[in-house]
């Protein structure tokens, strides 16, 4: 599948830049993916697409505020404004040299486990926090892909920590907690970012009623 191919490429550590395209009318849902990609690489530019359609629905996102909160460039693209696409392409040609992207913060027990794992990981093109997170998730297929970046010591420590965490997060509770943290972070980022006003069509319908 395309999603798995994209994940494999990102996890190879070879991506110099990543462009993530989001639907302006579904920003909060799309932001979960943005945050997950930021865990793999800080070299992300966000493109908010279909701005015209969002505005017709009465939604106006504050892209400057969104960029400040995410810690990476955010550009809007509108079909009516050809300059918006040109600005995005120029930004991709001249990316910022330093970025401090927003992190997803997990429940305290999981954060403590990440802190224990990170120092045990060898240097690699991928962030230690991301690798530690994947060790805690324990997905066999992904760990196989990442095996070149994982020392035997880190793999053993990850297995031991997963077993210890099973007491506080039995069954699927650990993966559910990780997913929930991403959703909550996206909700916090989006707070106040989108201004909602009645769309023109909705106003007309109200007048007719």
Predicted features and spans:
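Canonical P-loop GTPase G-domain recognition
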Residues: 52-105
């Amino acid at each position: 599948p395309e999603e798995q191919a994209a994940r494999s490429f990102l996890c190879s550590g070879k991506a110099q830049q990543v462009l993530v395209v989001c639907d302006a009318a579904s920003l909060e849902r799309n932001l979960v993916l943005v945050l997950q990609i930021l865990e793999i690489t800080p070299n992300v530019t966000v493109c908010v697409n279909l701005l015209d359609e969002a505005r017709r629905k009465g939604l106006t996102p504050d892209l400057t505020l969104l960029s400040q909160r995410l810690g990476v460039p955010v550009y809007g693209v509108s079909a009516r404004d050809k300059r918006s696409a040109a600005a995005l392409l120029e930004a991709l040609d001249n990316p910022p040299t330093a970025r401090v992207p927003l992190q997803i913060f997990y429940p305290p027990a999981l954060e403590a486990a990440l802190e224990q794992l990170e120092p045990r990981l060898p240097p690699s093109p991928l962030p230690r926090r991301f690798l530690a997170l994947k060790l805690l998730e324990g997905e066999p297929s992904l760990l196989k892909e990442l095996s070149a970046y994982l020392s035997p010591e880190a793999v053993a420590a990850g297995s031991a920590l997963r077993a210890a965490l099973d007491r506080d997060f039995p069954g699927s509770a650990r993966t559910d907690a990780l997913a929930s943290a991403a959703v909550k972070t996206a909700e916090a980022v989006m707070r106040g970012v989108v201004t909602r006003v009645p769309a023109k069509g909705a106003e007309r319908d109200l007048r007719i009623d």
